[in-house]
C-alpha cells in the first residue's frame, strides 16, 4: 500500500525497489533498490516488498518475502540498517522498538536506530500469527493467531502477559483505535470485533 510522506508518495514494487513519487506531478523523485533477487531458480529468486511501508520519524521500514527488513532514511534515501528477518505482515512500533512478526510466527523487538534485536518470542511459531499492533500507552503489543487467540506481550521483554479467545476463527488483521489499548479485530469469518485492554 502506498504511503504519503509530506509531498511524496512512497511505494514498494515487486522488483524489490522503493520509490518516492511526487504527489503533484507524478514524477519519480527517487528510487532505492531494497531487495535483490538471489538463488539458482525462479522460486528462490522471488523478492517483493510485501508489508506496507512503516514510517517512524525520519525512517521508513520495509519488509519483504524471502528477504529482510530494511530501515531507510527518508531525507537521504540511504539504508540505515538491515535485519535478516523475512515477513509479509504489517510492522508496528512502540517508542523506539520496531515490532515484527516473522513468516514462521516468531515475534521480534528491534531497536529502530541500530537494527539490533532486543528480544525474540518463539512461543507462537507456526500458528499463523498476525502482524503486531503496538499499544504505546501500555507499553504492550497484541497479535492474533490462526486459532483465534489474541495474545498480549510486553514490549520491553517480549514476554506473553495476557491471552483471550475470539469466537470467529483465525485473526486476519488488528486495527488500532487509540494508543491506550482500544482496537478492532478482523476474523476469517468476516466478523469485526472491538476490544480494550483493561
PLM region spans:
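WD40 beta-propeller blade core
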Residues: 19, 70, 108-109, 151, ...
Amino acid at each position: 500500500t502506498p504511503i504519503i510522506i509530506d509531498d511524496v508518495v512512497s511505494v514498494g514494487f515487486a522488483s524489490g525497489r522503493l520509490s518516492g513519487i511526487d504527489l503533484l506531478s507524478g514524477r519519480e523523485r527517487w528510487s532505492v533498490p531494497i531487495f535483490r533477487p538471489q538463488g539458482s531458480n525462479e522460486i528462490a529468486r522471488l523478492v517483493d516488498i510485501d508489508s506496507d511501508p512503516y514510517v517512524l520519524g525520519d525512517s521508513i521500514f520495509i519488509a519483504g518475502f524471502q528477504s529482510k527488513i530494511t530501515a531507510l532514511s527518508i531525507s537521504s534515501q540511504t539504508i540505515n540498517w538491515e535485519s535478516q528477518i523475512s515477513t509479509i505482515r504489517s510492522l508496528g512500533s512502540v517508542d523506539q522498538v520496531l515490532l515484527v512478526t516473522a513468516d514462521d510466527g516468531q515475534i521480534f523487538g528491534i531497536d529502530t536506530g541500530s537494527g539490533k534485536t532486543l528480544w525474540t518470542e518463539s512461543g507462537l511459531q507456526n500458528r499463523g500469527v498476525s502482524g503486531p499492533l503496538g499499544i504505546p500507552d501500555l507499553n504492550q503489543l497484541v497479535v492474533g493467531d490462526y486459532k483465534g487467540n489474541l495474545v498480549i506481550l510486553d514490549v520491553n521483554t517480549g514476554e506473553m502477559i495476557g491471552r483471550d479467545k475470539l469466537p470467529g476463527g483465525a485473526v486476519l488483521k488488528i486495527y488500532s483505535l487509540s494508543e491506550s489499548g482500544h482496537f478492532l479485530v478482523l476474523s476469517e469469518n468476516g466478523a469485526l470485533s472491538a476490544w480494550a485492554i483493561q
